[in-house]
Amino acid sequence: MNYDVIIVGGRCAGATTAALLAREGVRTLVLEAAPRHADMPLSTHFMQPPGMDVLDDIGVGEKVRGVTPPTRRARYRMEDQDVHGPYPEGRPAYCVRRATLDPLLQDAAEEAGADVRFRHRVVELLGDGERVEGVVVEGPHGRERIRARLVVGADGRASTVARLTGVEEYLVRHPQRAGYWFYFPTPGLWHDDPRYADFDGAIAWEGDGLRYLFQCDGDVLLMAAAPPKEEARAWGRDYRRRTLEYLGRSDLFAPLLAETAPLGQGRGYLGAPSFYRRAVGPGFALVGDAGHCKDFVTGHGMSDAFLGARRLTKAVLQDTPLAYERYWRERDATTVPYHFDAVHQGRTDLNDAFTRLIFESMKESEGLSRRHGLVLDRRRHPRNLLTAREMLGIVARGVLRGRLLPVAGMVKNAVAWRGYRRQERVYQDLLRDVGARAVPAARSDATPALSTPR
C-alpha cells in the first residue's frame, strides 16, 4: 500500500504530526525504529504552554494533566538572589517523562487513523535523483519498499532523512554545558517543608554551575546538573556519583538529596551542537529536532516539535510549493529568537555582575517576573524582558550605589544582543518574502498533490 505521507520517527514530532494529518484524512504511515513503549534516553521533558496547546488539539493535553502536576510558579536563583516567576494564569507548564508521554502520542496517532509501525528502521530513500518518492525500511519481516508523495523526517538530531538528503546546516552553535539528570522518588520534604512551599520547580545559577529541579508524573522529581563541559568531561563513567555531588553543593538541592535516592542509572551527555537544517526539499520535509535543535537549557525543544507539527500539517493540507517554503521560513523566524536565548542562557559566564543586578530588579518588581512568564508562553520576545530604558536605569542605579562592574556586563550583552537581532531580521525578511509571493498558484511537480482528505 502506498501512502500520502510517510513519517520517519514516531515520538514528539512524528507522532504529533501523524495525529494531526490523520485527523484530516491524510493517509499517513509512521515508521519508528524503537519498540513500542521504549523510553527516550535524551529529552528535555519540559512542555511550555504553547506546546500543551498542540497536545490539546490531538486529545493528549488532558491526559498529561491527569498524571503530571503543573508547574505554575518557578524559582530562579542567581547566587543569593531568588526570583519567583509565575506562568500566565491558567497556562502552566508540565514536566512529563518520555516513558509516559510517548505512548500517549503514539496512541493518539493510531486513534486518528495513522498506521504506526514499531521496530521499522529506514535505511534508504527511494527517488529518481530529483525528488524523494518513498523509503526502504527494515522491519521484523525483512526489507520493504514503500512509496509516498511526501517523506517527513521526524527522527531527531541524528536524522536519517536529513543525512540521506544531504540538507545543509546553518546557525550551528556548540554548547558550553553538559547535561546529566536523575529521577528521584519525591520526598515528604518537597510537600511539607516551607522552603519548598512557594514554587513548583527551580533553576539555579551558582558560580559557573547550573541546576534544575522539577516535579514529574509518577510522584518523582527530576534533578539535573548542567556543569561546564570541561568539568563534566572529567567525570567519565563516574558521572552518577559526580552528578549527585554537584547537585548537593546547592543548599536548594541538598536537603532533598538527603531524603531520597536516584531511580536507575540516570542519563546525560556532554552536549551536542544546536543547529538549523533546511526544512523542505523535493518530496521531503523535516520537523522537530531533525530540522532544528537548540540548547537544552531553556526547555523549549519539545514545544518546538509540537508547534512544528502543527505548522507542517498546515503546509501539507495546502500542498503548494509556497506553503512548504512558508513552513520552513515560519519555523526559522519564530524560533530563532529562542535559539539565541538558549545560546545566551547556556553560557558558563552568564552569572556576572550585570545579570545578578537584573535578578535583583526582578525580585523587586512583580511586573518583570510576570513578563518572564509571557516569554515562556511565547507572547513576548525573550530580549524584550526589559526595555533599553529600563536596563539603563537599573545599571545607573547600581552605579550610584558604587557598583561599576555591571556596566561592562551590560555592554557585553548589548553587543551580543545586537548581533542576535541582526540575524533574526534576516529570517524575518525571508518570511516576509514568502508572504509577498503568496498568490494563487497551480500545484508544482516539486510537491505533488496529496489525496483528497476523507
Language-model segments: what does each one mean?
Residues 1-13:
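Beta1/beta-strand and adjacent pyrophosphate-binding region of the FAD-binding site
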Residues 6-8, 22-43:
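Glycine-rich FAD pyrophosphate-binding loop
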Residues 41-75:
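N-terminal FAD cofactor-binding segment of flavoenzymes
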Residues 53, 70, 75-164, 171-177, ...:
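Conserved N-terminal helical subregion
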Residues 67, 231-325:
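FAD/FMN-dependent oxidoreductases across multiple families
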Residues 142-144, 154-253:
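Conserved FAD-binding catalytic core of PHBH/FMO-like flavoproteins
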